[in-house]
Amino acid sequence: MRIGVELNGVLRNTLGKIEQTYQKYMIEKMEGVDDKNSFKYELKLPITSLELSNHLMFENEGDLYSFLYEEFPMEIFGHSQSTEYTTFNDLNEQYVNLRDSHDLLIVSDEIGKSKPSSLFFLSKFGCQLEKIKFYSNSTINSMWNEIDVLLTANPTLLLNHPEDKLVIKYETIYNQEINTIHKIKKIKELEEIIKQIATC
């Protein structure tokens, strides 16, 4: 079986780092500026969805894109924390246990400078998986073609996946309302779920 493990939300706490970076570089930078014509940056917490424009106030979508992928991609995507303290120790151990009978790969929705930043993140944490598949909205079908099972926290992927593919939900605050057959709370639970799926 080919198993895709999503980077954002499953292995990397991307939303936490986005929140921290926005607070530091957008809100704190503008504190004390009394220009009536300047834009008021505002952070609406908690971040309970992947619709970032609902939580991070920018003048327009272009500014949000620039913040994520042009101005701070290494800060956000390269220097994020892992989702759990032992994420990569657990993932690497399961990779070693499963690699003789299953193919594990990292999949991630990335564009522009977030790709090299994500590679830095994976190397920083010592990820041993040999294959990484970057995709975007326009190339998402190529990601689905490479896997049979996807471990994801992304609500869109949990709800909209090809019928011949299985999804495993990694539980987060922004996907708790979505019901799936397979779900985990910790990355170390993945191996047991894969064994259950393989015997079905």
Q: What annotation goes with each model-predicted range?
A:
Residues V149-K186:
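Acidic, Mg2+-coordinating phosphoryl-transfer loop and its flanking beta/alpha structural elements
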Residues N141-W144, L190-C200:
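Short amphipathic alpha-helix with an adjacent loop that forms part of the alpha/beta core around
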Residues D109-N160:
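Substrate-recognition "cap/lid" segment bordering the active-site pocket of phosphatases
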Residues S101-H102, L129-E130, N145-D148, D164, ...:
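Short, well-ordered alpha-helix to beta-strand connector turns
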Residues F58-I106, G112-P116:
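Short, acidic loop-to-helix structural element flanking the phosphoryl-transfer center
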Residues M1-F67:
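Active-site neighborhood of HAD-like aspartate-dependent phosphohydrolases
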Residues I132-S136, I181-E189:
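Short acidic-hydrophobic, aromatic-tinged amphipathic segments that line or gate anion-handling sites
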